[in-house]
Amino acid sequence: SMLLLLICTITAQAQEYHVETPGTLQEVIGPGAEELTRIRVTGTLNDRDIAFLHRLCWPSKPKPKGMKYENYLKMAMEKEDTLKPCLRYLDMEDARMVNDALPARAFDGSFIRDYKLPKTLKKIGESAFTCNVFLKELIIPESVEEIGRNLLFFSIKVEKVRFPDNLEVMNDFLCAECWKLKEVNIPSKVREIYSGIFNGCPKA
């Protein structure tokens, strides 16, 4: 049982990778990336690294045109256990993004259950966490000043979102169709709130 305990502890710990040169995360991780369930990344990342991370937590194909979102989500959730890649926990807290910006659709449709975002992040592109069907909580770092529209659109299990106090503009549909959302803050510095932020959120 001691051995079993040891194995469980090892599995629960995140593998750690340091990126010295932006754009080289794939080379730093090397073979076997698709087997990883938890990783912690430090150093400096660019959009190429984010695209690679996205592939590691994005087993479903993009939503076909014309398919209803509900049907797409159902299909994605049914496939979770049958498809690799396996990444479910991603800690980027001590990494830095080039330009301090997360690109649009960075983790659209991903199967991540827990993100820790870079604590120096200033901007999050639109639809960054759309259709994240297993995510329950998203804490956005206090450093973030700008968030694109559709942030968590159809992330149907999200219960809690924490926006940074310095956010001045809340863009369209930030949390639309987050059916379980019940805990969310309106930042103290907000001066503009756009439409449909909490559309389809009966509990928010």
Feature locations, PLM:
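Short, intrinsically disordered, low-complexity terminal segments
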Residues: 9-11, 125, 201
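Bacterial Sec-dependent N-terminal signal peptides
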Residues: 1-15
